[in-house]
C-alpha cells in the first residue's frame, strides 16, 4: 500500500475481529475495496502476541468462533496455538491474508466534511538486524 492508495474500508488490526470484519465485508460488499493495517509482523492479535505456557480462551470457541467458519475442534475452550491456526486458516481460505499490510500502525485519523473522506496516517516499521564488530 502506498500513500496514494485509496480503499473504501480500512480495518485496523488483523486479529480475530479484524479477520472477521474483512471476511464479512468481502462476502456482503464484494464491490468495496479494503485493507487491514496490522502493527505487528503477523496476523492473529492476542493469539500471536502472547505465547506463554497454558494460554487459552476464556470463552468457548463455538461462541467466540466465526459464524461463517464454525469451530470444529472438539476442544471448546481452546489453547492459543489452536486459535491462531484457526485465524490463519480462515484468512487464507477467504482471501483476506492478501489484504493485510503488516508492520503498519494507524496513528491518526482525520475526517474531512468537505471531501466526505477519512485520511488515516500510519507508520510503517522495518525490522533490521545489523551485524556489529566486536
Regions found by a protein language model. Give the residues of each.
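Glycine-rich active-site loop/strand segments that organize a redox cofactor
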Residues: 45-86
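N-terminal Rossmann-like FAD-binding beta1-loop-alpha1 element of flavoenzymes
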Residues: 9-35
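Single conserved hydrophobic/aromatic residue that forms the stacking wall/gate
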Residues: 127-134
Amino acid at each position: 500500500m502506498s500513500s496514494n492508495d485509496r480503499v473504501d474500508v480500512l480495518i485496523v488490526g488483523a486479529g480475530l475481529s479484524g479477520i472477521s470484519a474483512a471476511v464479512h465485508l468481502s462476502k456482503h460488499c464484494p464491490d468495496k475495496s479494503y485493507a487491514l493495517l496490522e502493527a505487528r509482523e503477523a496476523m492473529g492479535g492476542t493469539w500471536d502476541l502472547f505465547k506463554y505456557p497454558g494460554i487459552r480462551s476464556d470463552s468457548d470457541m463455538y461462541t467466540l468462533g466465526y459464524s461463517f467458519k464454525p469451530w470444529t475442534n472438539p476442544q471448546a475452550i481452546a489453547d492459543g496455538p489452536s486459535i491462531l491456526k484457526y485465524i490463519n486458516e480462515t484468512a487464507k481460505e477467504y482471501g483476506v491474508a492478501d489484504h493485510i499490510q503488516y508492520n503498519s500502525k494507524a496513528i491518526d485519523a482525520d475526517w474531512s466534511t468537505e471531501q466526505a473522506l477519512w485520511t488515516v496516517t500510519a507508520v510503517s516499521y522495518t525490522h533490521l538486524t545489523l551485524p556489529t564488530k566486536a
